Amino acid sequence: MPDAVQAPYPAYRPEPNMQTITIAPPKRSWFSLLSWAVVLAVLVVSWQGAEMAPLTLIKDGGNMATFAADFFPPDFSQWQDYLTEMAVTLQIAVWGTALAVVLSIPFGLMSAENLVPWWVYQPVRRLMDACRAINEMVFAMLFVVAVGLGPFAGVLACWRCLSTPPACSPSCFPKRWKRLSPARWKAFAPPVPTSSKRSSTACCHR
């Protein structure tokens, strides 16, 4: 039996009673025009403060190519040292990630408004906002001053950097734990002895 030939879809034809609706362009209010004027004024004023020099970049842009050319050809004469330092870098990343994940869990729990009272999650959230507002280089310098220049300072700096993005950030966990019911956390509570239940029931009856 030959396969049935499927007929092509008919071309779309608008019905005669359909009306075309024309959307009027948005009106420019004085407030929007004033806002754009303020933005342009801020850009103009900030030009000198930021020392914008595009002509210097175009003129001396060849220095970047000269500097980048010094990277080639690479020298692998000390490849054993390179492998050793690569292993240390991976170990720093492992411990930095582990610290970021482990420390994010309690901070995330203390930031969920459906699990803790407001006087707990509000200060914790503000503390995390302050940590995210401070640049990573400031924390890196503090860690170097505290523990010295070495792998441990790199672990602490890696932990600080990994705590910023949403992947391991404590601010990511409250958004997920808000959908949880506090009744689920009762499973972690210790069981109440049967004798205490009976004594409390007897006291109530009395």
UniProtKB/Swiss-Prot annotation:
Name the major location. Answer: membrane
Q: How does it assemble?
A: If the reading frame is restored, the complex is composed of two ATP-binding proteins (PhnC), two transmembrane proteins (PhnE) and a solute-binding protein (PhnD).
For this protein, the record's Gene3D superfamilies field holds: MetI-like
- In terms of superkingdom, the source organism counts as Bacteria
Q: Does the keyword Nucleotidyltransferase apply?
A: no
- Residue ranges of the TM segments: 30-50, 92-112, 137-157
Protein localization: Cell inner membrane
Give a short account of what the protein does: N-terminal fragment of the PhnE protein, part of a phosphonate usage operon that is cryptic in K12 strains. Growth of K12 strains on phosphonate can be observed when it is used as the sole phosphorus source after a 60 hour lag period, suggesting the operon is activated. An intact PhnE in strain B is (AC A0A140NFA3). Part of the binding-protein-dependent transport system for phosphonates; probably responsible for the translocation of the substrate across the membrane.
- Coiled-coil spans are none
What the entry lists under InterPro entries is as follows: MetI-like, MetI-like_sf
Q: Does the keyword RNA-binding apply?
A: no
Phylogenetic classification of the source organism: Bacteria, Pseudomonadati, Pseudomonadota, Gammaproteobacteria, Enterobacterales
Q: Which GO terms describe its biological process?
A: organic phosphonate transport; transmembrane transport
- State the name under which the record lists this protein: Putative cryptic phosphonate transport system permease protein PhnE1
| Membrane-topology descriptor | Multi-pass membrane protein
* Gene Ontology cellular component annotations, sorted alphabetically: plasma membrane
Ordered alphabetically, the record's keywords are: Cell inner membrane, Cell membrane, Membrane, Phosphonate transport, Transmembrane, Transmembrane helix, Transport
